Amino acid sequence: MAKQRGKLIVISGPSGAGKSTVVLKALEGRNDICFSVSATTRKPRPGEVDGKEYFFVDLDKFREMVENDEFLEHAEYVANSYGTPKAYVEKKLSEGMNVLLDIEVQGALQVHQKMPEAVMVFIIPPSMAELEKRMRSRGTDSERKIEARLIRAKEEYAAADFYDYIIINDDADKAAKEFSAIITAEYCKYDLRKNYLSEVD
């Protein structure tokens, strides 16, 4: 029997939603999920390994990849370019791995256009008040930055109807179980299992 193709799982949500915590809890004990590796023009930091943290490329190579449509999405951030290489994602999916892409809404919509079969998951806190509380509890952001992030969060919420699932992260353990359940449910869909029906007399 041919190896079942993996799923591309796109996760988005506002800063402070707890995406990283939820995902890391959900990944505990699983070996069927890997994070996507982005290409970047940023210089490697001490200890970073090419192909592990990022694929490090120069600007000319990055532009060539853009022109050749080699990215599922790409964007510029703090004077550096970042992109999700199609080839890496396709290789992992063909190996049966579920590929996790934690990305902001604009990039997620780019991915959805190129791979409509991607599983789109939006993680949010139980309320905007809770989101603001979490941002302030960090104690690292200025008032201006917090206000900007809250405005950005409202803009991201407006794009949530492009997503397949919404996880309300009021409890990280519960949210992680919901995330794992989503992956399980995706493999139980009719189109993936309809061949078994032909075996019924």
Locations of regions flagged by a protein language model:
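Extreme N-terminal, non-catalytic leader segments
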Residues: M1-L8, N31
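NTP-dependent small-molecule kinase module
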Residues: A2, T140-D141, E155-D201
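P-loop (Walker A) phosphate-binding loop of NTP-binding proteins
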Residues: S12-P14
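Conserved lysine of the Walker
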Residues: K19
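ATP-dependent small-molecule kinase phosphotransfer cores
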Residues: T40-V99, Q106
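Conserved phosphate-donor/acceptor-positioning beta-strand/loop module used by diverse small-molecule
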Residues: V99-E104, Q113-S137
